Amino acid sequence: MRRFLLAATSSVALLLPVGAVAVPAAAAEPAPPVGTVTDFGVQSTALTVFEGHLGTDAAGQPAWYGAQMGTPGVVAMVDPVNRTHRATFELPDSSGGWGITQSDDGTVYAGSYPNAHVYRIDPATSAVTDLGAPVAGQTVLYGFRPGRDGRIYGGTYPGSHVFSYSPTEGFRDYGSMYPGQHYALDVAVDPDREVLWAAVGTGGHLIRLDLRTGEKRDIWPADLQGDVNHPYDINLVGGRLFVKRSKLQALVLDPDTGAVLADNFTISSRGTSGLAPDGRTVYFTSGTSLWHYDVATDTLGPVRDAGGAEVRSGGPGVGFGFLDGRLHALIGNYFGDALWYDPTTGANERFKLPFPHQPIDINNITTAPDGRVYTNLYINGNLSALDPATGTATNLGRIGQADGFGWHDGIMYQGVYPNASVHAYDPNKPFRAGTNPRELFRLQADHGQNRPVAFADAGTAMYIGSTPDYGMFGGALTRYDYTTGQHTVQRDIIPDQGVISLAVVGDTLWGGSSINGGGGTTPRATEARLFTVDLDTGAVTDRGVPVPGASSVTSLAAGPDGRLWGLADNTLFVVDPISGALVRRVTLPGRYGGVQDDLFVNPDEHVYVSLDGYLLRVDPLSYAVTVLRDAGTYRLTQDRQGDLWFRSGVKGNNNAVQYGARLLRYAPPADACPGSDLRVTVIVDGVDSGVANRYRPDGCTVNDLIREQDHATHEALMEHVTAVTRALVDAGILTRTDRVAIISAAARSDG
């Protein structure tokens, strides 16, 4: 079979052939149809500052360095005094960075994801040097801290390693901090004593590492070890170790013994400030207020202005520093907010800093009944709406990272990470944060979920599949009743597995699982499974393993033949929904790569699949697979008229997908026979020929072409069948043997 690849170029539509037949069509037969790919470009730019460091430029003047998301990721340099943007440094082959610091020799270092490289920035020359990966096989670097003699330290995911870099030595790997754990989320360093501390998740460990001997000791309080509310941000200040846990509760510990010096408070910021010029005060944000801790008395509380009112930060701090006795802070990730506070007078100001907006990877896509296409940005959470007719995209506002979408009666339902919150948005009303969309409920605190990923409209209720929170096992199936507004949750419906795909077939809800637990866990299960829910009784039935060895059933749909079609890793499967019996498995190009893969049943009856960057078209009669695109196809969805929408992407050597900020559309070829006759064999006036039914390139099946109703006499029908089958033989669609069998069936139909 010949295959044709579709390649998109910016802002133009390409007409390329996608049909495939064994031999060229005869002159009397229609030519293979064409499809179009249109690139609608970047839908919105946005700001996401992961962390900021208040340092200096080459002349010793103050400068904020902010690690930002982007395609590629960048570090922005902003003047905190003049409030001007001074420079943007690109981090090639990255999508952003979770670590940023400045060494004692003035060099700025950033740690990236998903390539886990260290980048060196010279403030004097603006040169950016990619120093490479400090530890092989990692995807994220965290928690950069300076040491002595130009050395910096950091942590990694998924190996929970700690490493250092110095200009003279290069990289040094101190190894994994705790067996079986994946995250070394932050580090704190005492250069004088050559001791480092590492926050390890998601199992809950705080490792004290002697940098000279390599000795490791877990100083996390024994009653908290193993708790998924694990150490997240850590700072060594004034001889104390400040620890923010993943759910924001905080502790102050003795850095050598782990003894608790203070607790029962929260930290919302990315850790704390360093020690203030007074030699005793440490600052952080708690909720949306500025707080302080006195290391001389081990007391803490909100910071107050001259009038006694709490100093409001307006959000969590993501970087702290001191200038001329004042505290300076970057506030929040998304809006460029900042704060200064003068502890002498109590004066303070909240203001904006001009961090530059960047194109950011699209996290998810959904299409509305009115034809608009909505995109949601990774982590940042901005929601944009595209009018395909004009090509105009409108940025609506932030909803949070939507890992799943559903629709009912014109209302968009959104599953938002990290609180596993479900929201409802009416596109016909103005977008107003907090009211439209409005939050319906959360699944994190009471049910241990963090990503609602699968939505299925069952008429009277929306069913939602979700995956467990960090360090936990067991997804959930939630039913939201449209009339009452109530929801019910069934946790761990497939033991130790998440619920990641749903489809309604008849009066039954089908679900597919993933063996993966929450972030930082190792799977307990070995194979993904199917289950059903009777929509009348609510009874749940385990339907077994559709594809042996598959880790995830990533997509399910009611097929064009009335059967259940699904995708498990790189295998397409078809199941009889009545008996539950497996009908077919087809191995597809590509492999499961971590980005949600999808399949959709098109109005042309074919099934379209995105897998590992491929766009595939599956014939529902023969199960033949045609490759339409062999790269750059992610987060597929389909609109009401059958056009397919997806985002761009480039797959790296570590299988991470980057550069996904562009939205594209594939319009399938025109279908000459909508609603095709999909009976398995060719049937003439009720007589089964035994010949497999099949498609002509223009979308007509053989059964479509034999039109018994158009012929009043049997003689006319015979002439018609003879002519149709002759043309199909000439086109290479039927063999001569097939033709004889079909004509024979037509002959037997008289009587």
Spell out what each predicted region is.
Residues 69-70, 114, 158, 202, ...:
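Residue-level signature of beta-propeller blades and closely related beta-rich strand-turn architectures
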Residues 670-751:
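Soluble extracellular-acting proteins and domains
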Residues 46-55, 95-101, 138-145, 181-188, ...:
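Repeated scaffold domains used in trafficking and secretory/extracellular systems
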Residues 40-73, 95-98:
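Beta-strand-rich domains and repeat architectures in extracellular enzymes and scaffolds
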Residues 63-66, 107-110, 151-154, 195-198, ...:
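Conserved beta-propeller blade signature
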Residues 630-669:
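Blade-level signature of beta-propeller repeat domains, shared across WD40, Kelch, NHL, RCC1
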Residues 464-474, 512-527, 651-658:
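Short, conserved, GDST-rich strand-edge loop motifs in beta-rich repeat architectures
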Residues 40-47, 88-93, 132-137, 175-180, ...:
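Surface loop/turn motifs at the tips and blade-to-blade linkers of beta-strand repeat domains
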